[in-house]
């Protein structure tokens, strides 16, 4: 059997009795970083010396078959550096391979940065989506945010402290300066901090430099029905500035939730015929 064990995200006191028992009984531990696993065993006073296997993003696919075969013979405890394996951490391919091989998979629930950030954010938690890390490159990041512009659910992201300020600036630019945001830093640790405000306010705050492990929680978009006429004007304005019609239609559709096809067809119909366009740019002979 494969056992997914949720480990503390900062406070060792959050290690559950079940996790401690599993660590003490484990003959095989699969860890994202074996050094972190050894540190956890020592910190919790576990004296057993299990076989340790490293499984990370770069070797999980190759290791999965070997670990599944081991799990046929003995319980295999799988750990990430912090939190639950498979959640923005290695483990998905292993669980998939185990399911395909009819090997049982169970989990020891526990600490989660995603759920903890949601709980303390002050934003709606009845429906949410976890988006992992925002893209590193600014253009890719803004594109990802545009795709989420009309997402009605609360959104949770992980972010590097080095990119926090620029990401918050992009959030303010793409999702709106007044969009409600919470930045959760060093959750469960000594210097835990939750900063709440608008995207613009938090972008200014982060510009001074922020350290630690970061979760960003963003309020979902309010349900506002887009006006097709206004959206069409936006498409035509983009086209007039040099954007291709197809690209302009796609961009406005992402931002408004309207149909790309309908916007494209409406813009085609609204543009003057080619002959009249040519007449404006070519003088009469």
Question: What spans do the regions from the language model cover?
Answer:
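General beta-strand structural signal in soluble alpha/beta enzymes
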Residues: 32, 80, 105-110, 157, ...
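A contiguous loop/helix-start segment that scaffolds small-molecule binding in enzyme catalytic cores
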Residues: 154, 161-285
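Short Gly/Thr/Asp-enriched flexible loops that form oxyanion-binding sites at enzyme active sites
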Residues: 86-101, 168, 172
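Glycine-rich, flexible N-terminal cofactor/catalytic loop recognition
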Residues: 1-57
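Class I SAM-dependent methyltransferase SAM-binding "motif I" and its flanking Rossmann-like core
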Residues: 92-151
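Loop/turn-to-beta-strand initiation segments
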Residues: 1-2, 73-77, 153-154
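Short active-site oxyanion
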Residues: 23-29, 102-106, 154-155
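Conserved helicase motor
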Residues: 53-62, 134-138
């Amino acid at each position: 059997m494969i056992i997914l064990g949720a480990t503390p995200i900062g406070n060792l006191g959050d290690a559950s009795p079940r996790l401690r028992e599993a660590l003490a009984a484990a003959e095989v531990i699969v860890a994202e970083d074996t050094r972190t696993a050894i540190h956890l065993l020592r910190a919790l006073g576990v004296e057993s010396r299990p076989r340790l296997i490293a499984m990370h993003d770069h070797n999980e696919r190759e290791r999965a078959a070997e670990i599944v075969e081991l799990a046929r013979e003995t319980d295999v405890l799988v750990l990430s550096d912090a939190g639950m394996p498979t959640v923005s951490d290695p483990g998905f391919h292993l669980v998939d391979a185990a399911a395909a091989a009819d090997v049982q998979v169970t989990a020891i629930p526990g600490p989660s940065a995603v759920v903890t950030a949601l709980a303390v954010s002050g934003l709606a938690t009845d429906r949410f989506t976890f988006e992992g890390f925002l893209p590193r490159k600014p253009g890719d990041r803004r594109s990802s945010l545009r795709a989420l512009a009309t997402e009605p659910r609360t959104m949770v992201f992980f972010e590097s402290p080095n990119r926090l300020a620029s990401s918050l600036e992009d959030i303010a630019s793409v999702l709106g300066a007044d969009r409600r945001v919470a930045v959760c830093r060093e959750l469960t640790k000594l210097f835990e901090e939750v900063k709440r405000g608008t995207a613009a306010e938090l972008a200014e705050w982060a510009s001074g430099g922020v350290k630690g492990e970061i979760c960003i929680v963003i309020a979902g978009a309010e349900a506002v029905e887009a006006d097709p006429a206004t959206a069409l004007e936006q498409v035509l304005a983009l086209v007039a500035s040099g954007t291709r019609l197809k690209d302009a239609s796609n961009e406005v559709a992402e931002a408004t939730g309207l149909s790309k096809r309908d916007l494209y067809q409406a813009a085609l119909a609204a543009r003057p015929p080619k002959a009249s366009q040519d007449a404006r740019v070519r003088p009469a002979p």
